[in-house]
From Swiss-Prot:
This is Transcriptional repressor NrdR. Disulfide bonds: none annotated. A zinc finger (unnamed) spans 3-34. Keywords: ATP-binding, DNA-binding, Metal-binding, Nucleotide-binding, Repressor, Transcription, Transcription regulation, Zinc, Zinc-finger. Binds 1 zinc ion. The gene is nrdR. Pfam families: ATP-cone (PF03477), Zn_ribbon_NrdR (PF22811). The keyword Nucleotide-binding applies. It comes from Thermus thermophilus (strain ATCC 27634 / DSM 579 / HB8). Negatively regulates transcription of bacterial ribonucleotide reductase nrd genes and operons by binding to NrdR-boxes. Its cofactor is Zn(2+).
Length: 153
C-alpha cells in the first residue's frame, strides 16, 4: 500500500487485528522510506440490493421507503413500530439475489401485514393493488373473512 506521507509505493504491516466486532480488519503499517506509521481498515463492501421498478428502471433498495408504507398502513392500529422497523431493516437479509422487483417487495409486505393486522393489510393492499372500486375492497375483505373462518375451525 502506498504511504500517505511520502508516496512510497510499498509499506509493511506491523500489526493486524479484527475491528468493529469482526466486521473489519485494522492494520498498522510502516513506511520503510520515511518511517512513519499509519492505520488502515479493510472492510467487506456489499453491493446494494437493487429494486427493479415496473418501468424497468433500477434503484437501490431503501428500507425507509418500505417502512413509510408500512407505517402508513398501520396508522392508528395496535401494531408496534419496532415490529415494522425490524421487518423493513432486515428485509434485505431475507432476499437471496442481487435484485428484486417492486412487485415482490409488495407481495412480501402484504404477506407480513396479513399475519400482523388485517386492517393494515387492506390499507396496504388498496394502494399496492390499486383498488379502483368498492367491489375490489369488498372482495379482498371477504377473502380475509373466509381465511379467518378457516383458521377458527
Amino acid at each position: 500500500m502506498k504511504c500517505p506521507y511520502c508516496g512510497h509505493p510499498d509499506t509493511r504491516v506491523v500489526d493486524s487485528r479484527p475491528s468493529d466486532e469482526g466486521m473489519a480488519i485494522r492494520r498498522r503499517r510502516e513506511c520503510p522510506s520515511c518511517g512513519r506509521r499509519f492505520t488502515t481498515y479493510e472492510r467487506t463492501q456489499l453491493e446494494p440490493l437493487m429494486v427493479v421498478k415496473r418501468d424497468g428502471r433500477k434503484e437501490p433498495f431503501n428500507p425507509d421507503k418500505l417502512l413509510r408504507g408500512l407505517l402508513l398502513a398501520c396508522e392508528k392500529r395496535p401494531v408496534s413500530e419496532e415490529v415494522l422497523r425490524r421487518f423493513a431493516y432486515t428485509f434485505e437479509d431475507q432476499v437471496s439475489g442481487p435484485e428484486i422487483t417492486s412487485e415482490e417487495i409488495g407481495l412480501k409486505a402484504l404477506a407480513f401485514l396479513k399475519e400482523l393486522d388485517h386492517v393494515a393489510y387492506i390499507r396496504f393492499a388498496s394502494v399496492y393493488r390499486e383498488f379502483d372500486s368498492v367491489e375490489r375492497f369488498i372482495e379482498e375483505i371477504r377473502s380475509l373473512a373466509s381465511l379467518d373462518k378457516k383458521e377458527g375451525d
